[in-house]
Amino acid sequence: MLAQLFFSAAALAGDWQRVFTSATLSVDQRAYPGSALREIRGVARVEASLNALMALLKDAAFNRHWVYRSGGAKILEQNGYRQAYVYGVVDAPWPMQDRDTVVRFDYSQAPDTRVITITITNCPDFLPRDPRYVRVPDFGGHWQLRPLADGWVEVTYQVFGDPGGWIPVWVANYAAVTSVTRTLQALPDVVGRYRDATSVYVLEPGPILGYSAPHRASVAPVFANASRTPFTTDNFNSQDRLNADSQKP
């Protein structure tokens, strides 16, 4: 699969097979029912607050600087803090055509464990297709943030998808593993940008869970880079890529 894609997490069939491991990251794959493509799951341990991780995941403008092969992302529509429709571009390696995606993110947090789940649902018809890109026909998945002791968080990124068009199966599966691995490897290097982030909608683990006291919450902007004007892919490619380039660290 070509980079950045946020694929579907189907809790179905097949034993997980380890394909990568390091001190703080493991990546597994398994067969997906009815498809030759693989479902991928990456699990990383990251030293960060839940607020910092959520701020990073919501920052569409910064997406291309850490999500593997991301060509940029932009919020199309948001419904409060807990839901947003997001457009993204995947920079496919030559000679393959670039892909684009439209997905819906839904956020929830368990009040007892403080575990955060962000589900990703495919919405390919939410935005008219652009002939310059292959619209990804099938993907979805989830992020899960589970607080651990001493300021660490277990970050799970589980995905499945079909990149569309013609791509050899072995290339798609290799790219899917690479995408999840590289994205989770990059995450610890960039989350520090958001160390001071706070939101009334994100609860840090408190004394009831045996952790330190939660951060003092303050109202923070909802999904970053939200558009107040009608979105077109022309506007995205001409302006947002320039904006993203200017924000490189």
Label the predicted regions:
Residues 12-249:
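Eukaryotic helix-grip
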